[in-house]
UniProtKB/Swiss-Prot annotation:
Keywords: ATP-binding, Chaperone, Cytoplasm, Nucleotide-binding. PANTHER family: ATP-DEPENDENT CLP PROTEASE ATP-BINDING SUBUNIT CLPX-LIKE, MITOCHONDRIAL-RELATED, ATP-DEPENDENT PROTEASE ATPASE SUBUNIT HSLU. GO terms for cellular component: HslUV protease complex. Belongs to the ClpX chaperone family. HslU subfamily. This is ATP-dependent protease ATPase subunit HslU. It is found in: Cytoplasm. GO terms for molecular function: ATP binding; ATP hydrolysis activity; peptidase activity; proteasome-activating activity. The gene is hslU. A double ring-shaped homohexamer of HslV is capped on each side by a ring-shaped HslU homohexamer. The assembly of the HslU/HslV complex is dependent on binding of ATP. It comes from Chromobacterium violaceum (strain ATCC 12472 / DSM 30191 / JCM 1249 / CCUG 213 / NBRC 12614 / NCIMB 9131 / NCTC 9757 / MK). GO terms for biological process: protein unfolding; proteolysis involved in protein catabolic process. SUPFAM superfamilies: P-loop containing nucleoside triphosphate hydrolases (SSF52540). ATP binds at I18, G60, V61, G62, K63, T64, E65, D263, E329, R401.
Length: 448
């Protein structure tokens, strides 16, 4: 769990996301409150539940990116799901409980990777010893006797010196291309189960039943020392991981620090006064989500998981519906409402130039691999931002994603030819490539 203050969290988010300060403040406070809760003594600690967040704003303004970056900052188990993929229990589709099961799978994977990383040094030492055993096979033990005692001591010293010499050569990479034959763990038998929609849980359980078949078997393989070293490190690191401790740690991490991001929550609202079959199903999804958000216990193949302290962040554009169209019980479980604003021309300019991995830097790095030096002038950046904003206003507003389309169209010719040399992108160049398309609404709908 991160110990960053809300100000530090917002500063980190500013490196990747432009604007949306209200949303950043809300998620920063929510994340800091997770840490604050851990400092409170029991029994009050268990009574403090996270305040779930509802983000409201058009597509492409940073809702998903804020949640994704937040999970990276916190190092917490994180999963993003689409509300439209789930259906009411009894209908064909995924059950909402699979959200928590998938979150546990993510936590198990992350916890295992962290445990392997912690044990890597010990695993490297063990792998090194196994390779040295192959390069320097131990001589058969001679029966100890009166005449054999002294030579055995000398041989032992010689073997130790030779082993140290080989160890030094191995670390210097002098044996990397040498082929050796060694015994490694045989890969476990894989069973892929193709399940019909709505039967994913059954398929997962069936796959788990057959997963252990063939585990522990050995096979002899011939490979280069460099490849063998990598494989043996993974094998030895896996041996050092305690599976029971790993499961317990992962489940605790999910319960205390898990974050679930539910996108497109507006698509499961009931619209209007009439209630069609689809509307009934949508309301059913909301009712099924209620226990998860409120706090319940979900059964997973690794154990029971309580959702009382998992943070839920829901988001939606709410263009055809309103947050008040959600069922009242679910509205009450999402107490923090944050509205994200549409992007302005200045926001588009900042997205193109100010973030750590802005689009202009990405294209410059890509084309630099073939000797093309892209230079973006201020006038070119200004025109790109204006055109992206203009097309969003005239057609569908897809937010910052419009910049991908605009940039691809702008640099299509340069990327295709990829001739070494300098290429200057100024206002005139942008107008020459995109001006006519942007002005004509009929063309912009199909091209940009």
């Amino acid at each position: 769990m991160t110990q960053m203050t809300p100000q530090e969290i917002v500063h980190e988010l500013d490196q990747h996301i432009i604007g949306q300060h209200k949303a950043k403040r809300a998620v920063a406070i929510a994340l800091r409150n997770r840490w604050r809760r851990q400092q409170v003594a029991e029994p009050l600690r268990s009574e403090i539940t996270p305040k779930n967040i509802l983000m409201i704003g058009p597509t492409g303004v940073g809702k998903t990116e804020i949640a994704r970056r937040l999970a990276k900052l916190s190092g917490a188990p994180f999963i993003k799901v689409e509300a439209t993929k789930f259906t009411e229990v009894g209908y064909v589709g995924r059950d909402v409980d699979t959200i928590i099961r998938d979150l546990v799978d993510v936590a198990i994977k992350d916890t295992r990777e962290a445990a392997i990383k912690r044990n890597r040094t010990r695993a490297e030492d063990a792998a090194e010893e196994r390779i040295l055993d192959v390069l320097l096979p131990q001589p058969r033990k001679q029966p100890s006797g009166f005449f054999a005692e002294e030579p055995a001591v000398e041989e032992k010293h010689e073997d130790g010196a030779t082993r140290q010499k080989f160890r030094k050569m191995l670390r210097e990479g002098k044996f990397d291309d040498k082929e050796i034959e060694l015994e490694i763990a045989a890969p476990a038998a894989q069973m892929n189960v193709m399940a019909p929609p709505g039967m994913e849980d059954f398929a997962s359980q069936l796959q788990g039943m057959f997963q252990g078949l063939g585990a522990g078997k050995k096979q002899t393989a011939k490979m280069k020392v460099a490849d063998a070293f990598k494989q043996l490190i993974d094998e030895e690191a896996a041996k050092l991981v305690n599976e029971e401790e790993l499961k317990a740690e992962a489940l605790k991490n999910v319960e205390q620090n898990g974050i679930v991001f539910i996108d497109e929550i507006d698509k499961v609202t009931s619209r209007g006064e009439g209630h069609s079959g689809a509307d009934v199903s949508r309301a059913g999804v909301q009712r099924d989500l209620l226990p998860l958000v409120e706090g319940t216990t979900v059964s997973t193949k690794y154990g029971m998981v309580k959702t009382d302290h998992i943070l839920f962040i829901a988001s939606g554009a709410f263009q055809l519906s309103k947050p008040s169209d959600l069922i009242p019980e679910l509205q009450g479980r999402l107490p923090i409402r944050v509205e994200l604003s549409s992007l302005s021309v200045d926001d588009f300019k900042a997205i193109l130039t100010s973030t750590n991995a802005c689009l202009t830097r990405q294209y410059q790095a890509l084309l630099a691999t073939e000797g093309v030096e892209l230079a973006f002038e201020d006038s070119g950046i200004q025109r790109l931002a204006e055109i992206a904003w203009q097309v969003n206003e005239k057609t569908e507003n897809i937010g910052a994603r419009r910049l991908y389309t605009v940039m691809e169209k702008l640099l299509e010719e340069v990327a295709f030819d990829a001739k070494s040399g300098a290429c200057r992108i100024d206002g005139a160049y942008v107008d020459g490539k995109l001006g006519e398309v942007a002005e004509r609404e009929d063309l912009a709908r199909y091209v940009l």
